């Protein structure tokens, strides 16, 4: 503390943090009681500004490249000290939190923020433990200083802002960024590196459980339906975005949800709608003159968000954990309109589609992305967050599926009857009916039809779903054009998969080019 006039606020409650955020002009209260905050020009993740410190302990285990960019250890130390000095004469907010709802696999983390609303976000998204760090593990530190401006020539950064992970020192530095999602994703990347060494598969997925204790996982990129489909009024939510799958069960890595708000409606997403109340942080959501949120307004960004603790969800699994999954769903948003709404996958096909991660960037979470929708291949359905080589995660997935006997499904939440702009997107009720059939076990032994070009088996009938939708060629008026698009998609899969060194049994499990 430089001159004694600044304060360090430790482990403040939700009410205290909201009060201080308002008093400091960091945000406004909305009509539904949530705190709305704006993040400025960076309204999404900044992948070009994310680095990992290159040090002997982790260097050989990280897949260095455009996602995991190296940062010099000496430069990190200098920048950390510089940011620490910057915060020394300012009020700061500190909480002792945990990442991972598993007694064995949690990581304790001390979160220091310059803004009160960032601390509220951290307490909503991470786990607020009854007893901090009961197992007395070494503590991670997050330091978040959004008003600090990096100088690339001096600091070795890419721009005026940065996110840097240091595994040797257990530190995460965020500087120059107001977008709060960087905090949660940085600790997800940390767990994605640490968990595989313990035989645990970290996953970019949501999870829920039924009355009988049956767990279902939903993998997918942002905007493909993870949060929406796991928030099922008939089931109990474990979590909406990040989980670990250990021998014996799955656990949430987080203690809250970070739901997309664009076009949110009470009718289609009642669980999320009801969770947005006092204590929730709304990020970049526009409000009207009466402070009523306008969820259809994307003036600031398509990537509007609500961050709330799991306590805001009535139907949730109280311990944030579940049994191993009977059903695993890969959510893909196919902009070409070629893929069927649901396919059953073999273990090898599961590994192939997990590594491929074919989907679309829908209302992308990355800074600078516009509303334009484009197809993409994102390894493990979350390429930006996985530090180790992809094969490590695919191998763990196959191991877990095989040892427990989980059934994997590929579900298309994208287009049918033509590509984006011509066809129409599967509506949420149709996808929910498919998911209901998956979780009930209806599709486990259902009769299927083989689609040769796509090398996929699709059910011939599903309760509550128009059978015409199940084989995509039936929804296209121009069958020749469908064949053309299917060929193009198959070729794209093959071209993308060439980079993977995997057994032929997995290589042969994809579409037939």
Curated annotation (Swiss-Prot):
Subunit structure: Monomer.
Binding residues for ATP: 185, 204, 220-228, 269, 305, 431
Cofactor: Mn(2+)
Subcellular location as annotated: Cytoplasm
Primary enzyme class: lyase
Protein function: Involved in the gluconeogenesis. Catalyzes the conversion of oxaloacetate (OAA) to phosphoenolpyruvate (PEP) through direct phosphoryl transfer between the nucleoside triphosphate and OAA.
Pathway connected to this protein: Carbohydrate biosynthesis; gluconeogenesis
Classification via InterPro entries: PEP_carboxykinase_ATP, PEP_carboxykinase_C, PEP_carboxykinase_N, PEPCK_ATP_CS
Domain of life from the UniProt record: Bacteria
Gene that specifies this protein: pckA
Family affiliation: Belongs to the phosphoenolpyruvate carboxykinase (ATP) family.
Main location: cytoplasm
Protein known as: Phosphoenolpyruvate carboxykinase (ATP)
Annotated Mn(2+) binding sites: 185, 204, 241
GO BP term (any one): gluconeogenesis
GO MF annotation terms: ATP binding; metal ion binding; phosphoenolpyruvate carboxykinase (ATP) activity
